Structure formats: structure tokens, C-alpha cells
Amino acid sequence: MKNAAAAVTALALLAPIRAIHERICVRKLALVLLCGLGTGLAGCMSFQDIPPREYYVLDDLAKAGAPRPAAQAGRVLLVNPASASPFYDTQNLVFSRSPGQRAYYQFAGWTERPGRRLTELLMRRLEARGSFKSVAATTAGIKGDFVLSTRLEEFYHDTGANPGSVRVEVSAELVDYAGRTIVAQRRFAQSVPATGENAQAAVAAFNRAATTLLDEMSAWIEGVVAQPVVR
């Protein structure tokens, strides 16, 4: 009886060891399979050699200027959250090697989704220019005079021709809040050359493109709102 009890105890102690051994074997097998799939590589990269994923901030490079008086300074602009196609509605940095083809950078991304970030930068820009009494999100629960809706149409690094360029397109629509009518619509597009075929060069070009885009959008919004609204 004592021998049987000892055998049962020994088996119970061996069970966790076997489980750990099996997990190690599975991990080794997964690494071997991963190496086997990478036939185009010069060797197999260990998990320790995989570079960390880097995140970049999309920024407005324009220097803040003095607020400028405007006829529409007493009005309130409400801004809807930007919409985007599912492929661009992500923090992944997108590139394209050929027309109609898109892919994600493996080790590079944005700190915020580009559509959301562009909306934030545009609101800051309009606030700084003093174009409106207030610029707020439609979710703020306040009344406004105009509602701005935007959609991110394109936002990618085109690497089809070295060193490539970035493509940014945004469509915008201004609505008269009281009359519930569309006042104006426009599509903005910027293509800026990149200095290299890598994520860092793409981000620098994206910042320049976004800055120019914000220049155009701000001027357009102010110009449209300055016109009398026909109801």
C-alpha cells in the first residue's frame, strides 16, 4: 500500500513537469515552422531579434499665428467625428507598391487613428485663428450655427516609384445647423514627396501634407461661413 501511494504521489509531481515540457516543445515547434516559412530570408530571426513596433505622431507643422478678426467670430462651429474606410480607420501606417494595392507597415503605426487626429488638429487650428466664437465636437451637446463633417478618403505612402510620396485626401461638407441644408462640399487632396522609402520618411511627408491640407481646409471653411446663408 505504501509503495502504491508513493507511486501515485510521484505521478502527481511529474504531471506539472510534463505540462511545462509540452509547452516548451510546442513553442520550439512553432519557431521551427516559422523559420521554415521564411524561405526568402537569409536566416531565421529569433524572437529577441524582432524589432519593436514604433508609433508616430501626426502633427501640424504650422506655427501658431495671432488670432484674426472675422465676421463669423460670433458663430459656433460643430465638428462631427471623421469617418473613414475600414482599411484606413486604424493606427496602422499604410503603404502601396502598385495602384489598387494597399498594405500595412509591420513595425510602424500612428499614436492615433489619422482621421481622428486630423479632426483634432483642424479644430485646434480654427480655434487658434479665432475664426469662430467656439469650435466644438457635435458630441459636446451644445447648439451651433454650422456642422462640419469630414471623411478620410486616402492616407497612404505610395512607394511605387522611389523614393515615393504620400497621398492624403479628405472630403468635407458644411451644413447649416438651423436650416439643415448643405452649404458647401469639397474634396481636398495633397501629394507630397518622401525623402526615403521607409516609415520615418513617410511620417515626415505626412506631416507636411497634413499641414498644407489644414491650411486649405481652414481657409475654405472660413470663406464659406463668411457668406450669407440663404434659407
Descriptions of predicted regions:
Residues 123, 127-131, 218-226:
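Sec-exported extracytoplasmic/periplasmic mature domains
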Residues 40-43:
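C-terminal motif of bacterial Sec signal peptides marking the signal peptidase cleavage site
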Residues 82, 151-155, 189:
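Generic short beta-strand segments
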Residues 101-111, 178-219:
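Short secondary-structure boundary motifs at beta->alpha junctions and helix caps
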Residues 3-31:
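Bacterial N-terminal signal peptides that target proteins for export
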